[in-house]
């Protein structure tokens, strides 16, 4: 059943210095961590000072605190080989460091080209999809690690098992998260490709769903074999996968996880392969979407030749990546959870999991919450504009909603794509649902203070800086004025 055949090779000399412009980004830092641990001289620049940058420095990466031409001069001195410069889509052509690298005639690679080289250099599994790819690749990495495979991992989130988003393993396998946001995943030629699901997103890059489908098809064709989600209508209609998985049926699929029990602290399911029951698993995570992510990870491991019995033993160690229903702490009787959900489908799935925790009375939180206060930060004007009414429908699953200003992610404003417009859409669709809009982040913390109740689950969602809400709550100043309470 094993797929793997290509020998482990290296496309880069270990003497090759590598410099990352924007090294603190989640995708860039993962590559930097792997390469520095493989013996390369690695440097980078990033104006942000955060735990990622601290981790890079601790591993031996030289990180400049600005992005200037002087950095290029510094890394080019006293080296036998000129540095290779790596950039991401987020780095504009006007970046002074990038301009200096071009003037110095340094070789410049997009991060996707570097990742593509790593993927092709050893047996690899690349995980793509609109939703769940970070969780799936994290669960896959963890299962491989707990079965003594020690994979190399390039993930778009922190893998709890390694407490890192990048790991230079000594095993034969590489796991990579394949981001579709800029279309660069078509460069990846993995031994096994995995597609978790597909629906329209990243409308700043894709004109329509057909363009996204065609891009993902190119990714699938570039992989030696393809594992896909049978429960996704778009994948089922448009893709010819080598193997399929489902959490709804065991008929006509290669792998299935059929739930027996779904509650707020775990999921129990029967596992099937080719229609044959293999055994039962207990997943220490709630939510049908997490069961699907776990089934994808298990299926990928089985295709890589691992035994089901070994995988069963590793399931107890599974944890989602950082910022996926991430319990941050308790504040004045409220439990604060942070989640990366920033698409209507993700918001809906996250709120469904929160509701399951409330209704079942079972949870891995310190105590079962009684009510859900959704604190949502829309991410990108283009996404807010495209999915305004879908976001309004999804947020209706909460008991009350607070909205932060749109996190631009570098985009220019679009008329009507505002948090106030979203609030109005919520009021139309859910007239009895309390909703309020914050003018800024400081007011948002005051709104949480005013509108939440003891026993609430304060669920912060978004891909911007909403993860700082917990820190802000612990530093609340006494406010003289605040809008009327939603909690009444």
From Swiss-Prot:
Keywords: ATP-binding, Cell cycle, Cell division, Cell shape, Cell wall biogenesis/degradation, Cytoplasm, Ligase, Nucleotide-binding, Peptidoglycan synthesis. GO terms for biological process: cell division; cell wall organization; peptidoglycan biosynthetic process; regulation of cell shape. It catalyses: UDP-N-acetyl-alpha-D-muramate + L-alanine + ATP = UDP-N-acetyl-alpha-D-muramoyl-L-alanine + ADP + phosphate + H(+). Its main location: cytoplasm. Pathway: Cell wall biogenesis; peptidoglycan biosynthesis. It comes from the Bacteria. Its EC number is 6.3.2.8. Coiled coil: none annotated. One of its GO terms (molecular function) is ATP binding. It is an enzyme of class 6 (ligase). It is found in: Cytoplasm. NCBIfam families: murC. Belongs to the MurCDEF family. Cell wall formation. This is UDP-N-acetylmuramate--L-alanine ligase. The gene is murC.
């Amino acid at each position: 059943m094993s797929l793997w055949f290509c020998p482990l090779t290296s496309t880069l000399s270990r003497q090759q210095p590598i410099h990352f412009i924007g090294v603190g980004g989640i995708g860039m830092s993962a590559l930097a961590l792997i390469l520095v641990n493989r013996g390369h001289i690695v440097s980078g620049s990033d104006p942000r000072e955060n735990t990622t940058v601290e981790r890079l420095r601790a591993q031996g990466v030289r990180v400049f605190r600005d992005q200037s031409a002087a950095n290029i001069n510094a890394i080019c001195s006293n080296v036998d080989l000129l540095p290779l410069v790596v950039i991401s889509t987020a780095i504009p052509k006007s970046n002074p460091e990038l301009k200096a690298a071009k003037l110095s005639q340094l070789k410049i690679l997009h991060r996707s080209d570097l990742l593509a080289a790593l993927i092709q250099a050893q047996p690899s599994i690349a995980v793509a999809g609109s939703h769940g790819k970070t969780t799936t690749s994290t669960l896959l990495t963890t299962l491989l690690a707990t079965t003594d495979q020690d994979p190399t991992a390039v993930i778009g989130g922190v893998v709890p098992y390694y407490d890192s988003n990048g790991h230079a393993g000594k095993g034969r396998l590489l796991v990579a998260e394949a981001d579709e946001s800029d279309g660069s995943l078509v460069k990846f030629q993995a031994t096994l490709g995995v597609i978790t699901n597909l629906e329209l997103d990243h409308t700043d890059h894709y004109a329509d769903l057909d363009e996204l489908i065609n891009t993902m098809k190119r990714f699938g064709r570039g992989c030696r074999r393809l594992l896909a989600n049978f429960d996704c209508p778009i994948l089922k209609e448009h893709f010819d996968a080598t193997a399929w998985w489902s959490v709804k049926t065991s008929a006509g699929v290669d792998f299935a996880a059929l739930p027996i029990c779904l509650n707020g602290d775990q999921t129990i399911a029967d596992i099937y392969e080719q229609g044959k029951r293999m055994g039962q698993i207990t997943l220490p995570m709630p939510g049908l979407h997490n069961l699907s992510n776990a089934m994808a990870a298990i299926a990928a491991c089985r295709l890589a030749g691992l035994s089901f019995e070994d995988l069963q033993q590793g399931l107890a160690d599974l944890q989602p990546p950082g910022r996926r229903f991430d319990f941050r702490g308790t504040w004045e009787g409220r439990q604060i959870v942070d989640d990366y959900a920033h698409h209507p489908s993700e918001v809906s799935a996250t709120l469904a999991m929160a509701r399951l925790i409330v209704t079942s009375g079972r949870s891995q939180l310190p105590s079962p919450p009684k009510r859900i206060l959704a604190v949502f930060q829309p991410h990108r004007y283009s996404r807010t504009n495209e999915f305004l009414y879908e976001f309004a429908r999804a947020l209706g699953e909460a008991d009350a909603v607070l909205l932060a200003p749109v996190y631009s992610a570098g985009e220019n404003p679009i008329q009507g794509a505002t948090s106030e417009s979203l609030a109005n859409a919520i009021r139309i669709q859910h007239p009895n649902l309390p909703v309020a809009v914050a003018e800024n982040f400081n007011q948002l913390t005051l709104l949480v203070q005013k509108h939440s109740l003891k026993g609430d689950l304060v669920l912060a969602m978004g891909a911007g800086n909403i993860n700082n809400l917990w820190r802000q709550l612990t530093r609340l100043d006494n406010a003289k004025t605040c809008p009327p309470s939603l909690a009444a």
